[in-house]
Amino acid sequence: MTHNLPYKTEIKVLIFDFDGVIIDSMSVKVDEYKKLMSEFTNDEGKIDKIVQIYKNSIGIPRETTLKKVFKEVLSKNILTVEVDELSRKYSQRIFKRLESLKPLDGFLEYITLHQQLKKHIISGAPNSDLIYFMDKLGIRNKFDSVKGGPLKKSEEIASLIRLDKVKNNEVVYFGDQKNDFLAAEEARVQFIGINANKNLFKGKCPVF
């Protein structure tokens, strides 16, 4: 992560996605998702489709993705209570696998360098997961607010703009997925892509 914001506008608020920006747990999450879905099908073709849906849905509330998987791939109806139980079960599995979790290189130095700015987290990950990981990392007190899914990122960004009483161009959202970029675009704030596929944001924003 770079140490200097690449914008001429005076930046007053930094908003971060979580996974892929502050931590990197994607390989573990994909592996555990495959194991979870293998309880419902042994068809490798379907498992591959499910994993692809999961990867394409990073940043989208987990419950939404589960419902999509059951409807479009497994062709099964699933009750909300069942979705909630699967989400809880999945969280427990990732917690066990991520006991030695650490922030991405440079992140702590970066927020320390910009400690005078307001800092928030907006993520599609369940709020309970966010709090668990941030407490484990010992970084919750470094942020003015933390908001996890289910949510619509662009609406939450707009809400923070009103709360912090700043202009749209005085806010930067850091993300690693296309839906993060689209949320920033919809909220009319600046965007920086972190650890992202450079082709995903080519010519549209800074990528690190």
Predicted regions and their residues:
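Hydrophobic residues in well-ordered beta-strands that form the structural core
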Residues: 24, 121-123, 193
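Conserved SAM-binding loop
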Residues: 22, 119, 173
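Short, acidic loop-to-helix structural element flanking the phosphoryl-transfer center
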Residues: 92-121, 127, 131, 154-155
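Short beta->alpha linker loops
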Residues: 28, 61, 102-106, 125-126, ...
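Asp-based, Mg2+/Mn2+-dependent phosphohydrolase catalytic module
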Residues: 1-11, 131-208
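N-terminal helical cap/lid subdomain that shapes the substrate entry/recognition surface
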Residues: 7-18, 22-105
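Surface-exposed alpha-helical segments enriched in charged/polar residues
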Residues: 38, 109-112, 162, 182
